[in-house]
């Protein structure tokens, strides 16, 4: 089968022989829906087959994957796959959360990487696309009581790096003040883990430059403009030396991007339109570089061309100042209220939809969720081809671009995937999550680590039922989105881990 884009260009075949789909051996970052489910959905939508580890060997929350099980999974499926998409965080540490802990020693990481290099060399004809993260600015928050140390570590990292650049005694004093708020053993482990992870990243760069890996995507997870991660990046950039096979950008949960990298054909095109501001010269929350740089690198990684004449539009909506409210730490009642900006942005989206453009909407007025004041004024959200607003800006971007590429190759729109983003990114993250957290705390539960996840999930479903029944004045600003989902089919929501940060949303066919 030969696929063609809208311009008629020949695209990579999705079938090796008649009736036999392209097979991708996929090792996700971890078991969360964004890393496990999203890539599988977008691969299967465009006719590919996703081969992934079975649940019984995979990580779950703080429990890392079974190394021997993962190794056996790769051995059993390497030959049948046409291309491999591998997360080094998963392979070498057992999950993203485990990559921030000392559960795996540096020597064990070296042994696992050496095994994989030898194993990969048994299949030199297989393209191998690799993803790995540069350790975030701070530690994991596995319970509410971790937040104090989390913020102190962020400040310690920020001011330490800034002081090394500016030489300012004031900056160094701030670093020392922050360090005094952190237990000594936590600081020692933090630096040990950073050293181990940086070693792995440097080694992955070397393997890519030697041609062992076909491409390497190094992702900077939650960060600031300054921090120990910046010093590590400077070393890595020097090692990379403009090698086109290696990309550094903000993000972490870029499974959809990695999945589509495996299948991307000759370049496809889209038109970038900034809504609410004239450009992307702002640093999104929890990122360390201008967002337009992350957009450019994501497009280059996938081979997407920015063509102003394209009828496919990547609409990036953000406020004029580029300042994002974090919907995780903000109560729903205090979400931003810029009525003029919301209406102007919605009017522009309405114009594009009325003119027949295929609009993929990246809603970045907020971080960790969409902005209902904006989306409620979109007259026909059912006409949107895609929507994304979850987590950080680069996470949301990767998800949207993954769907866009998959839709282009399939020649049809994955509206079920879009609706699941409405359920998750907008309805849950911008509204229900904060209410759920408030209720759980009132009953003595910690949203960061639930003691009774079954009860939390029951309350989650009840809140969605209230929303879809339009019970309460707060539900009215979601009426247009709820209508779209109701018209399409039934839905299901659940908590994949024992915390409320993410939800797993499904819309049934």
Feature names for model-found ranges:
Residues 19-509:
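An N-terminal assembly and electron-transfer interface module characteristic of large anaerobic redox
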């Amino acid at each position: 089968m030969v696929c063609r884009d809208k311009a008629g260009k020949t695209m990579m075949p999705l079938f090796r022989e008649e009736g036999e789909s392209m097979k991708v051996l996929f090792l996700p970052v971890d078991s969360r829906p964004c890393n496990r489910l999203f890539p599988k959905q977008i691969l299967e939508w465009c006719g590919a087959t996703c081969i992934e580890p079975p649940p019984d060997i995979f990580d779950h929350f703080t429990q890392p994957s079974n190394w021997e099980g993962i190794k056996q999974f790769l051995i059993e499926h390497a030959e049948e796959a046409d291309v491999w998409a591998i997360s080094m965080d998963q392979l070498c540490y057992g999950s993203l959360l485990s990559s921030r802990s000392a559960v795996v020693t540096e020597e064990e990481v070296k042994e696992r990487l050496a095994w994989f290099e030898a194993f990969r060399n048994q299949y030199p004809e297989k393209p191998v696309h690799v993803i790995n993260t540069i350790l975030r600015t701070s530690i994991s928050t596995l319970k509410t009581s971790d937040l104090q140390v989390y913020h102190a570590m962020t400040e310690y990292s920020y001011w330490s790096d800034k002081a090394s650049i500016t030489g300012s005694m004031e900056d160094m004093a701030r670093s020392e003040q922050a360090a005094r708020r952190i237990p000594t053993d936590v600081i020692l482990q933090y630096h040990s883990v950073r050293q181990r992870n940086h070693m792995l990243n440097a080694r992955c760069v070397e393997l890519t430059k030697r041609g062992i890996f076909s491409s390497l995507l190094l992702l900077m997870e939650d960060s600031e403009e300054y921090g120990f991660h910046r010093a590590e990046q400077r070393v890595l950039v020097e090692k990379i030396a403009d090698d086109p096979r290696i990309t550094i950008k903000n993000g972490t949960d870029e499974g959809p991007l990695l999945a589509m990298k495996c299948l991307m054909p000759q370049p496809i095109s889209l038109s970038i339109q900034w809504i609410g501001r004239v450009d992307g010269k702002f640093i999104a929350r929890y990122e360390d570089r201008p967002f337009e740089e992350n957009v450019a690198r994501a497009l280059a990684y996938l081979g997407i061309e920015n063509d102003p004449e394209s009828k496919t539009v990547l609409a990036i909506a953000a406020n004029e100042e580029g300042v994002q409210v974090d919907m995780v730490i903000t109560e729903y009642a205090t979400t931003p209220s810029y009525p003029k900006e919301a209406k102007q942005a919605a009017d522009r989206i309405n114009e594009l939809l009325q003119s027949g453009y295929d609009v993929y909407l990246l809603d970045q007025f907020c971080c960790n969720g969409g902005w209902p004041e904006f989306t409620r004024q979109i007259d026909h959200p059912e006409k949107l081809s895609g929507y994304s607003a979850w987590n950080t800006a680069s996470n949301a971007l990767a998800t949207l671009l993954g769907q866009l590429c998959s839709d282009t190759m399939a020649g049809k729109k994955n509206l079920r995937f879009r609706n699941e983003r409405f359920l998750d990114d907008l309805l849950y993250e911008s509204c229900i999550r904060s209410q759920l957290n408030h209720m759980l705390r009132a009953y003595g539960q910690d949203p960061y680590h639930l003691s009774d996840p079954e009860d939390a999930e029951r309350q989650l479903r009840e809140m969605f039922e209230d929303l879809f029944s339009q019970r309460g004045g707060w539900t009215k600003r979601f009426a247009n989105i709820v209508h779209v989902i109701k018209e399409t089919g039934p839905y299901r929501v659940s908590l994949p881990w024992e915390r409320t940060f993410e939800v797993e949303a499904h819309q049934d066919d």
